[in-house]
């Protein structure tokens, strides 16, 4: 367990990818190669029609099916187990996008100001996940509302949230109110 989990938690949120379009895209991209090789194996072994100009052997197609199956299962497990976790404790803001990154802690001392912000994941950051765009870095998996942090060094970080008011209020407990803007 992470050390900060022994502290009192002021805010906690878990978000998962919920966009239907993105889910369909990931599922299709993961399963298409598998279906492609299954179709090729069917053509070659059942219909006795060579699959392609330089066809693989049936054994080669079976190996391709096995590799495609492993790939599809891996991609789908990663996608459906992915989650953005955000904690606020007295030691800072703790964020991770599981299973792609460990918890990253942002100290309150380094935050110049913060605010609730609507954003476009695609236009502002090029999509969802761990992103870097013209507006800075972002951790987002769903929705279009987040907490925009401006650090004293000028860096920006947006953390997507479905609970912007709760996030903001928890953050307000630890940051200097004179430098914070809603």
Feature map (PLM): residue ranges:
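N-terminal membrane-targeting/pre-transmembrane regions
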Residues: 1-59, 166
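A membrane-cytosol interface segment of integral membrane proteins
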Residues: 5-7, 133-182
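Non-transmembrane, membrane-adjacent beta-strand/coil modules in membrane-associated proteins
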Residues: 14-16, 95-158
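A broad, low-specificity signal for short, low-complexity segments enriched in glycine/proline
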Residues: 46-58, 70-77, 107-122
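Glycine-centered small-residue hotspots that permit tight backbone geometry or close packing
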Residues: 48, 74, 128-129, 160
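Terminal domain-initiation and capping elements
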Residues: 62-63
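Short, solvent-exposed secondary-structure boundary motifs
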Residues: 67-79, 129-130, 136-141
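Conserved beta-hairpin
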Residues: 70-113
């Amino acid at each position: 367990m992470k050390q900060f989990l022994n502290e009192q938690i002021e805010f906690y949120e878990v978000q998962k990818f919920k966009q239907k379009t993105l889910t369909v895209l990931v599922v299709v991209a993961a399963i298409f190669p598998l279906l492609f090789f299954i179709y090729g194996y069917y053509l070659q072994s059942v219909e006795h029609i060579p699959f392609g100009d330089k066809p693989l052997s049936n054994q080669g197609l079976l190996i391709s099916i096995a590799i495609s199956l492993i790939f599809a299962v891996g991609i789908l497990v990663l996608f459906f187990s992915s989650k953005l976790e955000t904690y606020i404790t007295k030691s800072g803001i703790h964020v991770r996008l599981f299973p792609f990154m460990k918890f990253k802690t942002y100290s309150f001392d380094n935050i110049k100001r913060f605010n609730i912000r609507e954003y476009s994941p695609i236009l502002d950051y090029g999509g969802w996940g761990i992103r870097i765009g013209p507006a800075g870095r972002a951790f987002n998996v769903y929705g279009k509302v987040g907490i925009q942090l401006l650090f004293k060094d000028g860096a920006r970080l947006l953390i997507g949230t479905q609970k912007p008011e709760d996030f903001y209020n928890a953050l307000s407990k630890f940051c200097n109110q004179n430098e914070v803007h809603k």
